[in-house]
Curated annotation (Swiss-Prot):
Cross-referenced PROSITE patterns: ARGININOSUCCIN_SYN_1, ARGININOSUCCIN_SYN_2
Statement: the UniProt record of this protein carries the keyword Cytoplasm: yes
Protein name as annotated: Argininosuccinate synthase
Keyword terms of this UniProt record: Amino-acid biosynthesis, Arginine biosynthesis, ATP-binding, Cytoplasm, Ligase, Nucleotide-binding
Compartment list: Cytoplasm
Annotated gene: argG
Domain of life: Bacteria
InterPro entries: Arginosuc_syn_C, Arginosuc_syn_N, Arginosuc_synth, Arginosuc_synth_CS, Arginosuc_synth_type_1_subfam, AS_cat/multimer_dom_body, Rossmann-like_a/b/a_fold
Chief location bin: cytoplasm
Any one Gene Ontology cellular component term annotated for this protein: cytoplasm
Amino acid sequence: MSDIKKAVLAYSGGLDTSVILKWLQDTYGCEIVTFTADFGQGEELEPARAKALQFGIKPENIFIDDLCEEFVRDFVFPMFRANTIYEGEYLLGTSIARPLIAKRQIEIARLTGADSVSHGATGKGNDQVRFELGYYALEPGIKVIVPWREWDLLSREKLMAYAEKHGIPVEMRHKQGGSPYSMDANLLHISYEGRHLENPNAEAEESMWRWTVSPEKAPDAPEIIEIEFKSGDPVAINGKAYKPHELLAELNRIGGMHGIGRLDLVENRFVGMKSRGCYETPGGTILLKAHRGIESITLDREVAHLKDDLMPRYASLIYNGLWWAPERLALQTLIDHTQQAVNGIVRLKLYKGSVSVISRDSANTLFDQNIATFDDDGGAYNQADAGGFIKLNALRMRIAETARRKRAKK
């Protein structure tokens, strides 16, 4: 790809992408456009601009974009309409951010006339797949530069040596009292990988967790909150309306105080290996419980069961980077259709790491107390009808057992 003219780099300003920026300049001699995304990760992003300028990047080629609203509204909330969990536990906080990064990189490439894009994901992880599937889905002819699959800087020590040689200003945060882990944060979650976590038999240190208090140290009194839903999406907490990204941030704050949303997981990566990561997803954990609570009274039984059947497939599509694939879009259409009547209010109890639904109410409820009651229902439900229903459902089993007995007599 020696004919590269201009590349859009997903740039954080950290060690890896700073080295990549310099390497791209030296290896390809191309013009670089940097893109830094604000996903509500809680970090100051302007230093990324200053670093890019130090590399000689033109001011008009430096993009620092606030994507918080779009991220939660168009990616997180649609995913939560499906009650999405990967391998029974993971709420896909990293996975769901990647398609938006890819989308914005392609938009910037079109805006600036760039012919290529680049990212800092390694050749061992899922993110390389997620980014590149997104690139090609949105811009089939785009060129993709992946330094980790080309260079020989395959260790942290080699990266640091390269940075020192080229005068790249990179802070080693763990030597300055920061975290020694590889972290990824956005409004949905924060993840931790690397160091002693690479041993699945080693317990995560309490000092690692940043968003949540230890459940043992959470308040001794439970907190009751209400979440209102409209068409499957949360719109208010305790009667106060929020924009999507503000609502998730508020749930993170509340959940973090009660030690909600910690996860220590060994997962199966798309590229074939198992990996261990720790995650904090306080707001998402609350939201998932609340959404299932409101669906329990507003969804038809077979529709709810169909959603549950499809959810693992939908989760795998997102985890594997197939957000833009036609099958994910088709599933989303079905999922969104099921949410039309998912309106109402759910009350939840938060206490020392746990979330419990304690009540749910909706104008669209399918729960009929007159039918469900243990008391006299006034003829709303004829219990005698159950006999025929049971016999018909038992018919195939009765036939099978009768046939078995005939065979046994021979």
